[in-house]
Amino acid sequence: YGRRRHPKKLTPLAYKQFIPNVAEKTLGASGRYEGKITRNSERFKELTPNYNPDIIFKDEENTVMNHWPGVKLRVTEGWDEDGHHFEESLHYEGRAVDITTSDRDKSKYGTLSRLAVEAGF
């Protein structure tokens, strides 16, 4: 506690690779499904909106902007209610997020995935 971790070489994730290496809706990855959150539910009030055009992470050494100057994190899907995901999707609870980079350069996605894991997502 209180000690900085030594920087380590970041290895990009492969396409369709998960950390932990289990499907997103398993207990090991995300805990139990707690139920879909709708706009009319009490739990909807617990969701925190973020209208900031820049997403900032508390991460002294490996942010998207440090890794790729001028590139921003682009959130394509967060909490959702449209019914386009599987029935117990974590998007319906506000516990899943789909991300890309502002330049939409797919060659960055493996490293972006690794940065998300290192940031605690």
Curated annotation (Swiss-Prot):
GO biological process: animal organ development; cell development; cell fate specification; cell-cell signaling; central nervous system development; neuron differentiation; proteolysis; regulation of gene expression
Superkingdom to which the source organism belongs: Eukaryota
UniProt KW keywords: Autocatalytic cleavage, Calcium, Cell membrane, Developmental protein, Hydrolase, Lipoprotein, Membrane, Metal-binding, Palmitate, Protease, Secreted, Zinc
Entry's Gene Ontology molecular function annotations: calcium ion binding; patched binding; peptidase activity
UniProt keyword annotation of Membrane present: yes
Description of post-translational modifications: The C-terminal domain displays an autoproteolysis activity and a cholesterol transferase activity. Both activities result in the cleavage of the full-length protein and covalent attachment of a cholesterol moiety to the C-terminal of the newly generated N-terminal fragment (N-product). The N-product is the active species in both local and long-range signaling, whereas the C-product has no signaling activity.
Compartment list: Secreted; Cell membrane
Binding-site positions, Ca(2+) 2: E61, E77, D80, D82
This protein's GO CC annotations: extracellular space; plasma membrane
Chain residues that bind Ca(2+) 1: E60, E61, T76, E77
Record: residues binding Zn(2+): H91, D98
Subunit annotation: N-product is active as a multimer.
Notes on the domains: The sonic hedgehog protein N-product binds calcium and zinc ions; this stabilizes the protein fold and is essential for protein-protein interactions mediated by this domain.
Role summary: Intercellular signal essential for a variety of patterning events during development. Signal produced by the notochord that induces somite patterning, dorso-ventral patterning of the brain and early patterning of the developing eyes. Displays floor plate-inducing activity. Binds to the patched (PTC) receptor, which functions in association with smoothened (SMO), to activate the transcription of target genes. In the absence of SHH, PTC represses the constitutive signaling activity of SMO.
The protein's name in its UniProt record: Sonic hedgehog protein
Lineage start: Eukaryota, Metazoa, Chordata, Craniata, Vertebrata
Gene: shh
